[in-house]
Regions:
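Non-heme Fe(II)/2-oxoglutarate
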Residues: 29-136, 154-157
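Short acidic, low-complexity intrinsically disordered linear motifs used
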Residues: 11-27
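N-terminal acidic, proline/glycine-rich, low-complexity intrinsically disordered segments
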Residues: 2-5, 16
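Catalytic core of Fe(II)/2-oxoglutarate
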Residues: 200-287
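Short, solvent-exposed secondary-structure capping/transition elements
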Residues: 123, 127, 178-182, 256
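Catalytic core of non-heme Fe(II) oxygenases with the double-stranded beta-helix
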Residues: 140-220, 230, 237, 246, ...
Length: 287
């Protein structure tokens, strides 16, 4: 019996020692801090979205071929007067007829990217709990106009916006090696700059962003977003070539509703049939 008591007492002592050890470990862990898995969501429906895409080599090569054809055409249409910078600009019309290996045309590829931009902007306007409501929306896109910008050393484009469209784009096909800026602390030469609506005194947002373009960079942005292009210097006669286009979009369901309303209005405005008119009119041309 005495031996049994000793065994039980020894067991209790061990259990108490283990409990104290566990308590000390818990206190130590609490002192270090506890890691939690939390769910976070950034909500910014009021922000203009600037999307940057890296174009596949096949699209870059296709666009170079298309723009070479246009720039070498002596009968090309010069749109230079339509731009504030008066740079050489040309109408772009060959994308629809240039097919790519993945299927479809260069035009369809670019408009699909535009569609993805619209989709992401739509998601940004909704909180996560409403994503299911907007995920099924189908968008129709339309390219309003397209042009080439062929710039050389010293040429630039001052701050401007695009009109008569909802969004704009720019893709870079040729980018020369720029010489170092005359102000190393401000390496802006050759940059494209976007100017948003962020407050200049805000420490949590920026109202200006600059990017030194590389071949294949493709930007999509709201047409009202101000932007400009800085001049550049090179050690030779090298071209910076980009292609831009303006686009618009509409919810497919809304478009179909508009078409239906237009048809109804046309039917209502059509003149009523003449009462008592003969089914067949015979014209006698005999003298």
């Amino acid at each position: 019996m005495e031996n049994l008591k000793n065994v039980i007492s020894q067991g209790l002592i061990m259990n108490r020692a283990q409990r104290r050890q566990q308590q000390r470990a818990e206190k130590k862990a609490h002192a270090k801090g506890t890691n939690y898995s939390i769910d976070m969501e950034m909500i910014q429906p009021w922000s203009d979205v600037l999307m940057k895409v890296k174009l596949p080599d096949e699209i870059i090569d296709a666009m170079l071929e298309i723009t070479d054809t246009i720039l070498q055409d002596p009968d090309r249409k010069n749109w230079g007067d339509n731009l504030i910078a008066y740079v050489p600009v040309f109408r772009l019309e060959l994308m629809q007829n240039h097919n790519i290996a993945q299927g479809g045309s260069v035009f369809e590829f670019l408009m699909n990217v535009v569609g993805e931009y619209i989709k992401q902007c739509t998601f940004q306007q909704a909180t996560r709990q409403d994503h299911d409501k907007v995920a099924g929306i189908q968008w129709l896109t339309q390219m309003k106009s397209a042009w080439i910008v062929s710039q050389w050393e010293g040429e630039y484009n001052p701050i401007h916006i695009h009109t008569e469209c909802s969004l704009s784009t720019v893709m870079y096909l040729k980018v020369p090696e720029f010489l170092p800026s005359t102000k190393p602390e401000r390496d802006d030469d050759g940059c494209i700059m976007f100017i948003g609506a962020g407050h200049q005194n805000s420490r949590l947002t920026r109202n200006i962003i600059k990017h030194k373009p590389k071949v294949g960079d493709f930007f999509i942005f709201p047409a009202h977003l101000q932007h400009c292009v800085y001049p550049f210097k090179t050690d030779g006669d090298f071209e910076r070539r980009s292609v831009s286009f303006n686009a618009d979009f509409i919810n497919k369901a809304e478009w179909e509703k508009q078409q239906q309303m237009m048809q109804q209005q046309q039917q209502q405005q059509a003149p009523p049939p003449v009462q008592g008119a003969p089914e067949k009119l015979t014209i006698n041309t005999a003298a």
